[in-house]
């Protein structure tokens, strides 16, 4: 549940990084919570993984930026980049995700207590009729496995998780993505 005055920091990979150009998530949440005066700060970067923060020197750490934006809530979009490590990388991903959650819960970025964390799984790849693009089946199997791993960690750590994989695996309208 979002509270009045919440500052929501968005972390993760290309999905939230690209979404900042469209603003649909922020718009829908603001519209649904118009009386709550929410603030959104998108800190996502396409190359980010749960254990990495790819920025230039002296940019600041993830924790420093979460403190700068006084994060009450963290929307964490992870699992896509990590999924390229295949089945062999799942246990390391679960360990890194659990550590991220524990580390974030130990912080007080906003001065109002530990942040509330919402995990978002990767979306499924869209099958496009472009022979230049790779087949999506193997990648989607990995994405499904990483989504399941995220669900396990979310349950174990008592955080909310939004499964974006399942509804998108059923198919997206043509043109929903630029590259599948």
What are these regions (language model features)?
Residues 23-41, 48-180:
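Alpha-helical cap/lid subdomain in secreted, periplasmic
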